[in-house]
């Protein structure tokens, strides 16, 4: 065998979305006040294209493609290569993230400053009108 378990691909995406959020917004993924609010994963979809082997170097390219009232969609493109080798596409994934207010137990509107940071980073409008 020598390949990683399929669940590991989702872990790669998790690490990528945590890094994306902190680099784009300057905030940790738990973006609420004293833990009352945070971003939660509402949905994850993945299409596997090829195996990832234990010795491979994996890269995840992440971008935001859509922002709603309380959620946003991230797309992930996963590539892998042997050290010194050519990258190959191994998976494509989408993650739906929702801002959740634990105090009231439901989704909360995304803060405009986070929307502005994501749109600035992506260089285009992402929020639906």
Feature locations, PLM:
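HotDog/MaoC-like acyl-thioester-processing domains
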Residues: 48-57, 64-129
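Charged, low-complexity, helix/coiled-coil-prone segments
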Residues: 1-5, 18-21, 53-66
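Hot-dog-fold acyl-thioester-processing enzymes
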Residues: 1-41, 101-129
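Short coil/loop residues immediately preceding or within conserved phosphate-binding loops
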Residues: 41-43, 73
């Amino acid at each position: 065998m020598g390949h990683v378990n399929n669940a590991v691909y989702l872990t790669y995406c998790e690490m990528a979305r945590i890094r994306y959020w902190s680099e784009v917004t300057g905030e940790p993924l738990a973006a609420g006040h004293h833990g009352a609010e945070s971003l939660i994963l509402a949905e994850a979809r993945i299409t596997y294209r090829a195996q990832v082997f234990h010795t491979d170097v994996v890269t995840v390219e992440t971008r935001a493609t859509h922002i709603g009232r309380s959620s946003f969609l991230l797309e992930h493109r996963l590539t892998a290569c042997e050290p010194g080798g050519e990258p190959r596409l191994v998976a494509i994934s989408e993650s739906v993230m929702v801002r959740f207010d634990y105090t009231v137990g439901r989704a909360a509107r995304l803060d405009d400053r986070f929307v502005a940071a994501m749109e600035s980073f992506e260089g285009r409008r992402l929020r639906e009108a």
